[in-house]
Amino acid sequence: MGHNHNHAGGSNKKVLLISFIMITGYMIIEAIGGFLTNSLALLSDAGHMLSDSISLMVALIAFKLAEKKASHHKTFGYKRFEILAAVINGVALILISLYIIYEAIKRFSHPPEVATTGMLTISIIGLAVNILVAWIMLNGGDTKNNLNIRGAYLHVISDMLGSIGAILAAILIIFFGWSWADPAASVIVAILVLRSGYHVTKDSIHVLMEGTPGNIDVTDIIHTIEETEGIQSIHDLHIWSITSGLNALSCHAVVNDQLTISESESILRKIEHELGDKGITHVTIQMETAAHNHDNTILCQSQTENPRDHHHH
């Protein structure tokens, strides 16, 4: 159903793998450098990169699992794992950023001695690595529509800012002896991390809550279906995302009771084509006549009724 879903998946996977290898390798160097130079800005950036490499690894596993076929046990396959991974990733970012802020506050009152030359060298290398990875992601991956790639890309961008922060802090300490610059840089990094973590978590939870996809205009969709020749009205409408870039719709449509099966088929084909252009790739429409017992509201209102009275889904 999902148009060119698998093709995008292949290039996204390659981008994630290259990024994962580069970021993990550099993260180890930066963590060792942070301990040796005693720089919280470097350590916070390494912590951020650790969450990066974990998120990239989880994203890779998510892509691998998403390729598994649907089964009787899981009729959607493992496509949702990607969204679950994005939630874990977002929460990890939030926790890491809060810990960095806590550490930085302690350091403001007792700034330790920082080996600035080492700090400067490592953060410049870090910036170069981040720029390269961000470039690979932008050119090879789907940073706009795929939540997992977007999450990983946001990590890399805020990492880049983290490296810039560490470079500035090192320069300030070298030239002005401002030892508070190190914890200050880490707080700025932490706030950026917190922000991207919040957004990734919020968007992922919206998908898990079966929320309407952000790029779908519900009023326009209702209008499109109801304006189709042969459709009298619709009700019990649901629009949701199965995973990034795979939107689904189900509804009941009231049609003339004289309609033949082949006529209703051609109405369905027309609606599927129209909705496909509007970003909905998985469409299920139940055709029924006005005589069929139903609730007239467009959106499903069945929260409080007895399951036995429930209109058929």
From Swiss-Prot:
Please give the chief subcellular localization of this protein. membrane
**Ion transport found in the keyword field:** yes
One GO MF term on file is:
zinc ion transmembrane transporter activity
One Pfam family assigned to this protein is: Cation_efflux
Family annotation (Gene3D superfamilies): Cation efflux protein transmembrane domain, Cation efflux protein, cytoplasmic domain
Q: Name one GO cellular component term.
A: plasma membrane
Topology relative to the membrane: Multi-pass membrane protein
Biological processes annotated in GO: cobalt ion transport; potassium ion transport
Keyword terms: Cadmium, Cell membrane, Cobalt, Cobalt transport, Ion transport, Membrane, Potassium, Potassium transport, Transmembrane, Transmembrane helix, Transport, Zinc, Zinc transport
**SUPFAM superfamilies, sorted:** Cation efflux protein cytoplasmic domain-like, Cation efflux protein transmembrane domain-like
UniProt topological domain (Extracellular) ranges: 1-14, 67-80, 139-159
Keyword Plastid assigned to the entry: answer is no
State which ranges are Cytoplasmic (membrane side): 36-45, 102-117, 181-313
Where in or outside the cell it occurs: the entry states: Cell membrane
Q: Which family does it belong to?
A: Belongs to the cation diffusion facilitator (CDF) transporter (TC 2.A.4) family. SLC30A subfamily.
Family matches, as NCBIfam families: CDF
Outline what the protein does: Involved in divalent cation and potassium homeostasis in the cell. Catalyzes the active efflux of zinc, cadmium and cobalt, in exchange for potassium and H(+) ions.
Query: Would you tell me the protein name for this molecule?
Result: Cadmium, cobalt and zinc/H(+)-K(+) antiporter
Name its species: Bacillus velezensis (strain DSM 23117 / BGSC 10A6 / LMG 26770 / FZB42)
